[in-house]
């Protein structure tokens, strides 16, 4: 019970930061879809996806190693942070020289801002991960909110006052990241912890031994997550990709919730992995997460058309059509991601890569076929299928490390009901909203035991917190 309470406490802290920051971003969707054209939004989406691909390669995913190694009680925290920052600075300098050469050849207008976007992102991520690893979760949470707030204010000024378009949008992120870096340097006194003499070659090798296998893993994630957008842009242009990118905003609500969970879960998983009762811990948390994710995805499917009409600009109204299938894929992805945490906790990053690589190859193949014969929505279907296969693959493979006792009956029935709900809404079958509500009720009923159990745990924590404050 103590493990669950610790996890729940961390979830609450991370939720305050992530929900408030992501809510601000979500509320700005009407603004972005009105001041940016379909083409500009599509270009921004492609540039951010390019950055997502390149950042792990440039940084050697060292931020993951910083978090994992700094979590260990016996580790030299200053040494780990120094290695992470110094190695990243060297890599950023190399990247800048390469970017200069590329610019001289191509004269592509967005190269400079893209380099700044990636450089500030790399440094901020290392500082942020280190702050979380050493237990400064409140500072970590505050910084997340501040980062988003500054980014949004900068974006509003750059897009509406200065009319900088794509460059202004990305520059807003650069400004937000820079402010965040300065805040963490001061608040956690990171400037006192970074020392050149602390760079230890042996520790660096151990850290890169952990992080480098995550590079191809990240590339595979990129292929699985973003191949659809690249292929849509190639086949149908940036305008359709802009609509598809907006469609991803509703599934992002689920992603944010799951991200909050994983920020807390990584801490618990890394601490508890070697203990005997780990199997029951993983089993309980899996079923809590499963019930929650599938219920919230069903609710959002029912509301996707309403949300689209309220939130997005008139040029993007078609986005709702893609949302149910994207939500289905997000549900599968969330469960695959949970099982992927077992690889990180056990430091078995090789199998994380193998599972991702297999599905990434399949995703390319399916995207080519589905886009050709079904159209843009085929990309969403291909991605959902790949996430389902990744979940099943990992469910089988991770049993060698942690034996999770799955409630197969409730899982299979819930998955089938969500698939039926997706089909009903996408095809706009008559009275689809009524059928969707009935399916939601069935999913809640099937998972009622997990919901009740989790609710009791949450209420118990709240009562305990009130009691402690009363005694104080």
For each feature predicted by the language model, list its residue ranges:
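Membrane-proximal transmembrane or re-entrant/amphipathic helices at the cytosolic face
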Residues: 404, 423-472
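Transmembrane helical elements of multi-pass membrane transporters/channels
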Residues: 10-25, 147, 172-188, 201-270, ...
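Interhelical loop/hinge segments that connect adjacent transmembrane helices in multipass membrane
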Residues: 1-3, 112, 166, 170-172, ...
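N-terminal membrane topogenesis motif
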Residues: 1-24, 67, 75, 201-217, ...
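Signature of the first transmembrane helix
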Residues: 4-63, 92, 96, 147-152, ...
């Amino acid at each position: 019970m103590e493990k669950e309470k610790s996890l729940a406490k961390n979830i609450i802290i991370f939720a305050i930061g992530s929900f408030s920051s992501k809510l601000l971003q979500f509320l700005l969707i009407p603004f972005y879809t009105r001041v940016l054209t379909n083409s500009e939004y599509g270009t921004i989406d492609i540039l951010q996806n390019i950055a997502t691909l390149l950042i792990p390669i440039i940084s050697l995913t060292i931020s993951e190693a910083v978090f994992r190694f700094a979590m260990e009680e016996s580790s030299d925290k200053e040494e780990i942070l120094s290695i992470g920052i110094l190695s990243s600075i060297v890599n950023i300098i190399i990247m800048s020289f390469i970017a200069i050469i590329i610019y001289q050849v191509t004269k592509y207008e967005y190269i400079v801002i893209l380099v700044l976007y990636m450089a500030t992102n790399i440094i901020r991520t290392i500082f942020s991960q280190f702050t979380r690893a050493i237990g400064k979760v409140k500072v970590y949470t505050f910084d997340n909110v501040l980062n988003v707030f500054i980014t949004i204010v900068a974006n509003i000024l750059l897009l509406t006052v200065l009319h900088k378009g794509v460059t202004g949008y990305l520059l807003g992120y650069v400004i937000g990241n820079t402010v965040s870096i300065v805040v963490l340097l001061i608040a956690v006194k990171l400037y006192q912890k970074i020392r050149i003499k602390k760079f230890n070659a042996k520790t660096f090798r151990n850290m890169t031994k952990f992080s480098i296998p995550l590079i191809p893993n990240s590339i595979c994630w990129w292929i699985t997550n973003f191949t659809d957008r690249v292929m849509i842009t190639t086949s149908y242009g940036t305008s359709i990709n802009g609509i598809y990118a907006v469609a991803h905003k509703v599934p992002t609500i689920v992603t944010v919730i799951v991200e909050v969970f994983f920020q807390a879960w990584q801490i618990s998983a890394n601490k508890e992995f070697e203990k005997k009762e780990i199997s029951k811990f993983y089993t309980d948390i899996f079923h809590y997460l499963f019930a929650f994710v599938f219920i919230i995805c069903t609710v959002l499917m029912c509301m996707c058309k309403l949300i689209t009409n309220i939130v997005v600009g008139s040029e993007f109204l078609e986005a709702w059509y893609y949302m149910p299938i994207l939500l289905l894929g997000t549900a599968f992805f969330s469960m695959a991601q949970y099982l992927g945490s077992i690889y990180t906790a056990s430091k078995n990053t090789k199998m994380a890569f193998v599972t991702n690589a297999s599905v990434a190859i399949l995703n390319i193949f399916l995207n080519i076929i589905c886009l050709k014969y079904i159209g843009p929505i085929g990309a969403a279907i291909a991605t959902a299928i790949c996430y389902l296969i990744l979940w099943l693959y990992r469910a089988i493979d991770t049993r060698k490390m942690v034996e999770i006792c799955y409630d197969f009956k409730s899982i299979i029935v819930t998955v089938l009901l969500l698939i039926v709900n997706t089909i009903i809404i996408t095809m706009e079958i008559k009275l689809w909203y009524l059928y969707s509500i009935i399916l939601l009720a069935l999913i809640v009923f099937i998972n009622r035991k997990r919901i009740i159990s989790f609710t009791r745990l949450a209420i118990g924590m709240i009562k305990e917190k009130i009691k402690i404050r009363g005694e104080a």
